[in-house]
Amino acid sequence: MNECSILWCGKYHQNWENELHCHNYFQMVGILSGSGTVYVDDQPYEIEKEQVFLLCPQQLHAIHCGEKNAAPLKMLDVKFTVADPALFEDLVRVGDMFHLQDFGWFVRFFDKIIAESAQQRPYYYSIISGYLLEMLVRIVR
């Protein structure tokens, strides 16, 4: 049984806005560049490079891009579930937004997940689940 399961993962430019919404899984977003505002519950966060947002299941959130002439919002995004109750609770306690001491490892793990997913070689899902699990454990430590 996987301790965590990736539902979707990608690196993209967001040039649209979404309204406050929630879902029944976690979502982790890393900001690579751009401007805008992320709303989590009633709290607005001005977007900064190398921020990480950890959105919990059923948590209201929205992403609004910056001005039309501003640099596009480039993000890393993974949507996932967590089966392990202890890890689930630890992730809930992390907080909505944080900065990592080394954002580079975060980007490298995302790139490995994306590359492995694109190739879909045998056992790729076990590998990407392992990468995500390592990311999550590093974050909650």
Map each language-model feature to its residues:
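N-terminal regulatory/effector-sensing and dimerization cores
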Residues: 8-93, 122-126
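Amphipathic alpha-helical segments enriched in hydrophobic/aromatic residues interleaved with Lys/Arg
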Residues: 89-139
